Amino acid sequence: TSRPLKHKFAVRYPHSFDHGYEYGLVTADNRLLLGGWRNHSPTGEVGTYSIDVNPHIEEGLKQFARDHYDIVEEIDWEFSWSGIMAASKTGLPFIGPTTSPRVYACCAYTGHGFSWGHGSAKLLADIIAGSDVPAVARFFNPKAGF
């Protein structure tokens, strides 16, 4: 994620490139937030459990920003992080109570946390609050297992 930029972005909402393998958004304070690039890693990061930032991916995303955004100012990258990809058998995220008391899950986005995150958090909050939830929520049950 960059420091706030002066650049006037034409697209501020979440967007993706390369069939969703690279994605970005512009924050309210005009920072460029990018993610993805794992498909350019020799292993695709399959089987890795490290949360250390992969320099190949980080540099790839910085080059991606230079190649795909018409930003003339120097981009100062303030934040960088990594995460472990998780997937369920169905490819759908887990949202709801687990088999442990008072433990809930909101995970296993199969790399699509950008698109699933906000709605999943809302659904989990409704589940915890005991509010009515849509019938489709049963498909996200963590008790179904990985």
What label would you give each PLM region?
Residues 40-52, 63-146:
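C-terminal catalytic lobe of FAD-dependent flavoproteins
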Residues 18, 55-59, 71:
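Alpha-helix initiation and capping sites
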Residues 1, 51-61:
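Gly/Ser/Thr-rich active-site loops/lids in small-molecule metabolic enzymes
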Residues 15, 55, 86:
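Conserved phosphate-coordination/catalytic loops
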Residues 1-32:
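Flavin-dependent oxidoreductases
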